[in-house]
Amino acid sequence: MSKTIAINAGSSSLKWQLYQMPEEKVLAQGIIERIGLTDSISTVKYDGKKEEHILDIPDHTEAVKRLLNDLIHFGIIGTYDEITGVGHRIVAGGEYFKESVVVDDKVVEQVEELAALAPLHNPGAAAGIRAFRKILPDITSVCVFDTSFHTTMQKHTYLYPIPQKYYTDYKVRKYGAHGTSHKYVAEEAAKMLGRPLDELKLITAHVGNGVSITANYHGQSVDTSMGFTPLAGPMMGTRSGDIDPAIIPYLIAQDPELKDAADVVNMLNKQSGLGGVSGISSDMRDIEAGLQANNPDAVLAYNIFIDRIKKFIGQYFAVLNGADALVFTAGMGENAPLMRQDVVNGLSWFGMEIDPEKNVFGYRGDISTAASKVKVLVISTDEELCIARDVERLKQTIS
């Protein structure tokens, strides 16, 4: 019996979940937010309790110290020695990593080197890895990459139609993201459908603040909507998704506040999407409230959001030459029935039909009608559990 921590570290946050393995029992979970500020927030949930404290956490090393001390303070563990493994979620693994790996110095350097592919994620993840290695140097540390699942894409799918020297010299290509989530929900969908995964064609829709759609053929990713970075694909919470790239130099020339390409990319990453179009919020709950109030900007943002998701799902019906099921997961995918209904209503030609009595908040499972030729499933993703499982698997290889 061992205890494993799954870590999702960002530039100013550290989200964690502690498991008892191999039972896969969640012992505690929490998040440390606003790292680097004097009013950082540490939240711990365990045994039905919730503890929240505001304090000064200047960096990721102090965040990890706080996390470990909280585990002891609240009696969740007795000593640090009870923790035998830690797994880190890494958004971008580039072409270096086709599967999860045990961390060493070279791995950390490569994660940092790939920061350009995930500037909002990889630097914080690397800081989290370094912090754990400093404080718990003797435990097994593992990196689990969002991009690994998508390394099964064929070359004609992952290459962009630009001169090949940009791939050979600079590795410019589609990498995808959310792979851990897409892999998990595809496996769960096969169980739900009672069929082997290697016989199924699935379209998985991870719809959270970040949005990605994946075409899954017999258990493998054959195409996905995120690209060289997680900025590509449908409209998202704060990200634009796909736009005409010629817009970037045009905006630099027109808007004095946008001085260079980095400024435009920052705007596309952080000030666009639902929040940017609506001017209200990047949260679908706020957008739906705007719909009820007939706010025209909320209506416009919502309509663009639905339109872009439908288009990617439609593409992947073509890529797969049909599909057995459409799977919704992540924050909005699991908790926004109106969004699911409006997406599927626009895809009825493919033989999908939602049962309105099942398509309600909190329902998990098959939400399609008996007559629906393509099943529509709602499955809760569990990236943290996937990370913990990979830690346990890799621990066996080095024991």
UniProtKB/Swiss-Prot annotation:
Site residues, Transition state stabilizer: H178, R239
Entry note: cofactor: Mg(2+). Can also accept Mn(2+).
Needed co-factor(s): Mg(2+); Mn(2+)
Nucleotide-binding is among the record's keywords: yes
Superkingdom field: Bacteria
Gene Ontology CC annotations of this record: cytoplasm
Binding site residues for Mg(2+): N8, E383
Record's function text: Catalyzes the formation of acetyl phosphate from acetate and ATP. Can also catalyze the reverse reaction.
NCBIfam families membership: ackA (TIGR00016)
PANTHER family: ACETATE KINASE (PTHR21060), ACETATE KINASE-RELATED (PTHR21060:SF15)
Protein name: Acetate kinase
Organism placement in taxonomy: Bacteria, Bacillati, Bacillota, Bacilli, Lactobacillales
